Amino acid sequence: MPSLAIEMGARDQPLLAQTIGDNLRQTVARVPNNDAIVSLHQDLRWTYQDFYTRVQRLASGLLAAGLKPLDRLGLWSPNYAEWILVQYATAEIGVVLVNINPAYRTHELAYALNQSGCRFLIAAPSYLTSNYQAMVASVQDQTPELERTVFFWSPEWEALIAGDAQYQASVEDLRGQLNPDDPINIQYTSGTTGFPKGATLTHRNILNNGYFVGELQRLTEQDRMCIPVPFYHCFGMVMGNLACTSHGATMVIPSDGFDAARTLEAVSQERCTALYGVPTMFIAELAFEDFTKFDLSSLRTGVMAGAPCPVAVMKQCIERMHLREVTICYGMTETSPVSTQTLPEDSLVHRTETVGRAHPHVDIRIAHPETGETLPRGETGEFCTRGYSVMSGYWEDPVKTTEAIDEAGWMHTGDLAVMGLDGTVQIVGRIKDMVIRGGENIYPREIEEFLYTHPEIEEVQVIGVPDKVYGEQLMAWIKRKPDLASPQLVSHDDLKAFCAGKIAHYKVPHYVQFVETFPMTVTGKIRKVEMRARSIEALGLEV
C-alpha cells in the first residue's frame, strides 16, 4: 500500500526571526551601493542606501501624520517605485498595509477600506481610465474611519516623503518594540459568501516566504529581477520585492501594468537574470512581433505561477528566453503565498505536470475532502498546508478563519491535488467553483451577489468556461423577473453597462445567457457542472 500523502519541507536552513525592517537594514549594510529599484517607466534608479533613506523619511512622516503601530493604511496604486516605498515604510513602524487592487471600483474600494478600518489611504491619482481622486471622493461619506487620503506626487505626498526629523527618534525607538509575529499586511481574497476576506499576514509570514522563494531560485546580490506582476498581490510584493530585498537583488519595474514589449525591453536593457509572470504573460512575450530584437541571454531563472503551464510554453521559455532554471510555484494569499515550488534542476515534466514539493518549513498533505483523513499517495483529495506561512486569520472574521484553518493548524485550500511517491504535487481541480482568469482568482458567488442588486434580475448563476487566452472566462446565466413592463436588461451590453465602474473589469461576465430555468438536482441544488457543459457546447468552445 502506498505511503500516506504527507510531506515536511526541509528544516536545515532556519527561519528568519526578524521584522521586515531589520532584514532590510541587514541588506543595506551589506550592499549599500547595489541597485535596489530600477523603475524604467519612471526613469528612476535607487541604490539600497537611497531606498533605505527614503523609507526612513517616509516612516517618520507617517508617524508625524498620527499613525501608530497596528493602524491600517490602504495603498491603491499600480506598480510604481513609490508602492515599494510605502510597503517598507509601513513595515518599519508596524503600520498594517492594506493592499487595494488597482482594478477595484467604488463598491469594492469602500468595502476594503471599511472592513479593514483604514485610517489613512495613499493612492495614485489615476490609472488607465480610472480617476482615483474622483472615486475616493465619491466614497468619502461611506468610509467614516478614513481620516486622510494622500495622492502620489501631490504637495501632501512631497511633504510626507520629506519626513519629520522630530519623529526619526520615534522610528528608531519602535524597532525594539516590533515583533516578527505582529500583523503587517492585509490582502483581500474574495470569498464564496460574496464578501472579500482580509487575509492577515505577519512579518514572519511574508518575509520568510519571500526569502525562501528566492533561495529556491538561487538568488544572490548579483541578480536583477524583472517584476511585471502586480505589487498589490503576493506575487509582486512577497515573491518579488521581499525575495529581492532579503537577498540584495535588484527589483526592475518595466511598467505600471503588464506590457509585453516593455517587459522584454526591461530584461534586455537592464540585463535581468530573473523574470516573473503568469503563463499568459510569458505567452504574450513569446508572441510579441519583435521578440527577436531583444537580447534575453542574461535570463536564468524566475517564477511562473497562477495557472498551469503548457509543456510547449515551458519549452519555449527555456529555449527562446533562456529561462533554463525557471521555477513553478503554487500557493494562495492565505499562505503568504507559496506552499510548493519546483527546483531549478527539476525536469521539464516536473515543471509542467507538478507544482513541485513542500517549501522549507512547510508541511503539506492530501486529505479526504469530507473526513479530513490523510489519503494514500496517488489518490485525489484536498491540498492542505501547515507551518509558519499560514496567515494569522481573516481580519475580524473568526468564523471564516475557523472554517479555513483546523484545530491542528492545517489550512484547507479547497484545491484538489495528488501527491506522487516522490513528494511532488499535482493540482487537478477545485472543490469550490473558483474561476481562474489570467491568474486572477474569481469567486462566482461574489459576482452573483453584486448582480442580484440589479432590479430586474430574479436569479443569476455565474460559472467559468474555457478560454484560449485567459484560461477561463466568466459566464452569467440570468433569469429575469416576470411581467416586466419594459425590461432594460435585454443584452450583454446592458449588463456590462450596469457593471461599469462598480466591479473590477475582470469580474464582468464575458458571456451572458438569459434563461427561464436552471438545471437542478433532485434536492434543489443548482447543477453548475451541467450548466458549464451546456454552455461549452452552445458557444462552441474547446475544452
Language-model region placement:
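Conserved AMP-binding/adenylate-forming core of the ANL superfamily
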Residues: L16, A36-Y88, R105-A110, E158-A162, ...
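Conserved pre-ATP/AMP-binding loop-to-beta segment of ANL
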Residues: A17-Q18, P32-N33, F151, P155, ...
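Conserved AMP-binding A3 loop
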Residues: R45-Q49, I184-N208
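Structural core segment of the AMP-binding/adenylate-forming
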Residues: A64-A65, I93-A162
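Gly/Ser/Thr-rich phosphate-binding loop
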Residues: A249, L264, Q269-G277, L286-H350, ...
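Conserved ATP/PPi-binding loop(s) of AMP-dependent carboxylate-activating enzymes
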Residues: R357-H361, E373-A404, E440-I442
